């Protein structure tokens, strides 16, 4: 795996391999340290979980991080994304983690000779979020075939919905969407349903934040009405299968996508997803750098 910009780039075998490595890290297996490697995290959108998770993963792997802040960089002087990245490559950075508001920004970076890991591009792709979600599901079910997955919320503007739909469908899951009519994404070939019609048969309920920053113009939005129609209420939670799970990529708007009392309820896996994120991102970085250097993944001395 030379880089990771889209879930469409991964085969099912590669997905399983990444998950297996992440699980080994989670069990305590020691990584092969990349102490002579440099990484830079370029976040052009706000982030808590993804940015901090990558930073933790990089430290666990022994990588040396070259700090980058958009507010103090030459981007403010009009420098292009490509020239910024080419500059970092030129001074010796070995890999880049990038989040950017532009869909498919990585297509402009094909002239780079170092790997790019996509930390999210507009409403396009969020591959490491999808992989950590898949890891979380795998730990619960060990298989994806015929699992019923319901993704609820702002489908049209969600890179998480797109990445997870593509990956979970390829792995054999049955994916359905629930969303207001104006947030339907017709490019994704999944049925749209009413939550109350399918909640009892669903194995995974995946809730999405409303992407206010990606809506053009004024957004007519009533949080209470949205919660009643598309959120996970206590009644819906109680109607779920006993073994079903609740997921959310976060940040969570309590009382909107999900009742506040349910965020840490027994079926919720929201904070487990966050924990898995560090191990999964360690796995992604390791697979990319180990392949680049033809090295080993685990420290054989441990």
From Swiss-Prot:
GO cellular component: cytosol
Stored Pfam families: OTCace (PF00185), OTCace_N (PF02729)
Keyword Isomerase: no
Enzyme class name: transferase
Residue positions binding L-aspartate: 77, 159, 209
GO molecular-function terms, A-Z: amino acid binding; aspartate carbamoyltransferase activity
InterPro entries: Asp/Orn_carbamoyltranf_P-bd, Asp/Orn_carbamoylTrfase, Asp/Orn_carbamoylTrfase_sf, Asp_carbamoyltransf, Asp_carbamoyltransf_Asp/Orn-bd
Record EC number: 2.1.3.2
Pathway(s) annotated for this protein in UniProt: Pyrimidine metabolism; UMP biosynthesis via de novo pathway; (S)-dihydroorotate from bicarbonate: step 2/3
GO biological process: 'de novo' pyrimidine nucleobase biosynthetic process; 'de novo' UMP biosynthetic process; amino acid metabolic process
Catalytically driven reaction(s): carbamoyl phosphate + L-aspartate = N-carbamoyl-L-aspartate + phosphate + H(+)
NCBIfam families: asp_carb_tr (TIGR00670), PRK00856.1 (NF002032)
Subunit record text: Heterododecamer (2C3:3R2) of six catalytic PyrB chains organized as two trimers (C3), and six regulatory PyrI chains organized as three dimers (R2).
PANTHER family associated with the record: ASPARTATE CARBAMOYLTRANSFERASE, ORNITHINE CARBAMOYLTRANSFERASE, MITOCHONDRIAL
Name by which UniProt lists this protein: Aspartate carbamoyltransferase catalytic subunit
Organism: Staphylococcus carnosus (strain TM300)
